[in-house]
């Protein structure tokens, strides 16, 4: 498969990623969204929208769960135990805490084009840097599986065992994680029929794939 991060439909899109008002601070608003999703810092977003801390926290928890599910899918894994899912979420939280991004420019709406913010992102290279080690592990796992080494495991335990090897590799390299060259994305802010500014799901996925890029490979579990 092509290792590619593709977020499923996010429950938080309609409520969370909206803003309105005159003299809209698009740079601050986009930064507040990034801070909420990646840093767990809700203060600015709450100031923009008036959404309660408990609601924003719930939306972020849902987003992290979706992120964990996308992680499993990217590595060809089915549903593991709750403990392994929590471990994936904990890893993602540690990765996202290191996210580096900033708004570098704004382009006002004109001639039918939406208002746009330029967002500079430095990619987290942990997946690319450790791809070879992960590939060796997956190959070894598949060889053992071919000889029925995991035949006595339940499906849940099977995926726990498979994901444990990948998570162990990534967790052991959190301290020496490197960053890629900054990449700038255009983030359109479009008004919906209610006059609310929104960021599309495709744009959120593009941000995610830029911040945490996957190596392109045809190898899977």
Ranges and model annotations:
Residues 1-7:
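Bacterial N-terminal signal peptides that target proteins for export
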Residues 41-44, 124-125, 195-197:
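Primarily extracytoplasmic ectodomains and periplasmic/lumenal surface modules that are beta-strand-rich
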Residues 138-152, 157, 161, 175-221:
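Short beta-strand edge/turn micro-motifs at domain boundaries
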Residues 165-168:
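Exoplasmic/lumenal beta-rich domain surfaces
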